[in-house]
């Protein structure tokens, strides 16, 4: 009995070690977004609350927590309240299979890719439930857009994943990282470049980020699926969006960019200099790079029209992935060096 309780406590501690830094990262990702986009638009960004505005995320959190939670009169109150949790929980539980370094993973399962793909797709249920439960036309339009968008881009994302599975020969995330050993030229983003780009575009669409943020298009449907949400409900949707961004960026780093592996592996004099850098630091740097690209894309591109979004998903990305899957299969059979 005591042994079982000890194991349970240890699992809870490991979960907290992952979740608490993740929530803090989400808070400061909002700060980074406002700063980066501010600099791109030749503004300063938040600079009043704390040194250089560093306490701004906590001020925003305090503001949202203290706001009144308003539940629309004709809404389904039970579903309206739990919908934000349906959106947030998948983006948190996906971290259970993320390897931060060799052997540093909560659950090293053999179907890690499948599990993570499923978790990254489940958040759309929270959006759909929120749109329907709000009993609002704008919210429902936003929810339907988001559902159609997610389903469309999941297909391209799934095909891109198949390419990685063909190349690595495993669905275990640790094995996929280890299959990229040998330096930057051995990482999968080089032979699978079209799949890498498709996966990245689909990841932006999955997380409802600009230029694919049609689910919350301010100029068309006000705030979209969370138009009726205020206070902590809105904060949870906000949290789930940014947590999903970090999860997709981590997924990209592991599948295509060597995870925790050093880019200088195989370059003797550089490898000796950077040998002391822990693996998880390289992983964090790669995640930060993808997050920066998220913000850069948001500040650069205008929002797509709905028909353009669907056309890109069905008529461009899916055919590209199918063609490159055939090419990847041929490269695997031909044992093209240095990857296969």
Curated annotation (Swiss-Prot):
One cellular component term from this protein's GO annotations in UniProt: plasma membrane
MF-aspect GO terms: NADH dehydrogenase activity; oxidoreductase activity, acting on NAD(P)H, quinone or similar compound as acceptor; quinone binding
Keywords from the UniProt entry: Cell inner membrane, Cell membrane, Membrane, NAD, Quinone, Translocase, Transmembrane, Transmembrane helix, Ubiquinone
Transmembrane as UniProt keyword: yes
Enzyme class at the top of the EC tree: translocase
Highest taxon above the source species: Bacteria
Enzyme Commission number(s): 7.1.1.-
Chemical reaction(s) catalysed: a quinone + NADH + 5 H(+)(in) = a quinol + NAD(+) + 4 H(+)(out)
UniProt record similarity statement: Belongs to the complex I subunit 1 family.
Function: NDH-1 shuttles electrons from NADH, via FMN and iron-sulfur (Fe-S) centers, to quinones in the respiratory chain. The immediate electron acceptor for the enzyme in this species is believed to be ubiquinone. Couples the redox reaction to proton translocation (for every two electrons transferred, four hydrogen ions are translocated across the cytoplasmic membrane), and thus conserves the redox energy in a proton gradient. This subunit may bind ubiquinone.
Protein's name according to its UniProt entry: NADH-quinone oxidoreductase subunit H
Organism: Legionella pneumophila (strain Corby)
Taxon lineage: Bacteria, Pseudomonadati, Pseudomonadota, Gammaproteobacteria, Legionellales
């Amino acid at each position: 009995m005591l042994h079982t309780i000890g194991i349970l406590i240890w699992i809870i501690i490991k979960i907290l070690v992952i979740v608490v830094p993740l929530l803090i990262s989400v808070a400061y990702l909002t700060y980074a977004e406002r700063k980066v986009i501010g600099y791109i638009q030749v503004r300063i960004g938040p600079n009043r609350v704390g040194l250089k505005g560093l306490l701004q995320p906590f001020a925003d959190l305090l503001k949202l927590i203290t706001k009144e939670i308003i539940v629309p009169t004709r809404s389904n109150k039970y579903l309206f309240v739990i919908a934000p949790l349906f959106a947030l929980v998948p983006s948190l539980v996906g971290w259970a299979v993320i390897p931060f370094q060799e052997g540093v993973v909560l659950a090293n399962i053999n179907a890690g890719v499948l599990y993570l793909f499923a978790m990254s797709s489940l958040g759309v249920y929270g959006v759909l439930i929120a749109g329907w439960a709000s009993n609002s036309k704008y919210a429902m339009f936003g929810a339907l857009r988001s559902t159609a968008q997610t389903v469309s881009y999941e297909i391209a994302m799934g095909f891109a994943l198949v390419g990685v599975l063909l190349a690595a020969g495993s669905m275990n995330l640790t094995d996929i990282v280890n299959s990229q050993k040998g330096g930057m030229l051995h990482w999968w983003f080089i032979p699978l470049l079209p799949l890498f780009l498709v996966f990245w575009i689909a990841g932006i669409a999955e997380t409802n980020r600009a230029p694919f943020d049609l689910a919350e298009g301010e100029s068309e449907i006000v705030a979209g699926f969370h138009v009726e949400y205020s206070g902590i409900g809105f904060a949870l949707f906000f949290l789930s969006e940014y947590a999903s961004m970090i999860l997709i960026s981590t997924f990209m780093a592991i599948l295509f960019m060597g995870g925790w592996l050093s880019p200088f592996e195989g370059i003797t004099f550089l490898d000796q200099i950077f040998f002391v850098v822990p693996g998880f630091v390289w992983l964090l740097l790669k995640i930060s790079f993808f997050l920066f690209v998220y913000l850069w894309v948001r500040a650069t591109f205008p929002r797509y029209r709905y028909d353009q979004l669907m056309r890109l998903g069905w008529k461009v990305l899916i055919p590209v992935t199918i063609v490159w899957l055939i090419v990847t299969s041929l490269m695997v059979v031909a044992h093209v060096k240095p990857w296969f």
